[in-house]
Amino acid sequence: NFTRYLGQNRLKYFFYKWTINIMKNKITAHASGRINIIGEHTDYNDGFVLPAAIDKKSTFRVWENGTANTCNILSEHFQVTHQFDLTDFQPVKSGWENYVMGVVAELQKLGAPLKGFDGSFDGTVPIGSGMSSSAALECSLAVALNELFDLGFDNWQLIKAAQMAEHNFVGIKCGIMDQFASVMGRKNQVMLLDCRSLEFEYFPLELGDYQLLLLNTNVSHALADSAYNERRAQCEAGVKMIQQKYPDILNLRDVSLTQLAEFKNELSEVVYRRCQHIIGENDRVLAATNALKT
């Protein structure tokens, strides 16, 4: 019964009706979610991380719609569409729309000659699970638009555009790890990433009779609603204090635990603990990497 089908699928039907007669070239791009074996909050402190791509992914489909500037995007998960104009769009209060528009805005800053396009996306990365569903969404769209409009951007430019989308449109001052792992991850490999130099090394994760378990705590979080930016600001406050005595320090990456101890009475307890964690965590990442290699 087509009438009943239309009633149950009205949103999707009308979305595809917009483009069914003018679709030219449809591009489908995938980007993985990620786990981070060790290296928490070190990426935005120029530190080391040990992520790995997973088999959960975001899938984004895009195609030109024949207009100069109009874009229509369907979220398969939320069953909601969002329309915006390439010449005039701003962040909304919150939601997936900002991740999409943020990527578009950052590609435009790079000089991308975008035209009107439609798209839809879905994914298998659980939302709010800490496996970087947002980075996977951003990266899959960036890759798809790069192919659709033959923009010629390299992987690093796409990674950086996805990260800056989160900074400038979503409002989260995230590090580079999530987007880097989403684009550069390899099957059955972990990656040691230096978040300052962006040098990285792949190696197989061979655990013998042991396995890594990824457990669902059923606790959902959103970086935009969390204390993520606050934690970053606390780390930066610690660096600012330390720089008064050690001006060559650029980030907590450059600070030793001995140096940090000199400021224990000058830093708040919370800021001191944040800094202490980062310094120790960098050492733990390198120790874990060496252990996994042997």
Features from the language model and the residues they span:
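Residue-level detector of intrinsically disordered terminal segments
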Residues: L11, N21-I22
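Short glycine/threonine-rich loop-to-helix capping motif typified by GTGT followed
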Residues: G130-A136, A261-E266
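Intrinsically disordered, low-complexity segments enriched in serine/proline and basic residues
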Residues: F2-Y13
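Short acidic, glycine/serine/threonine-rich loops at helix termini
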Residues: V49, G130-S133, V170-G175, L193, ...
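ATP-binding N-lobe of GHMP and related small-molecule kinases
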Residues: I22-A135, A142-N155, K160, M164, ...
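C-terminal nucleotide
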Residues: I22-R34, I38, T59, W63-K93, ...
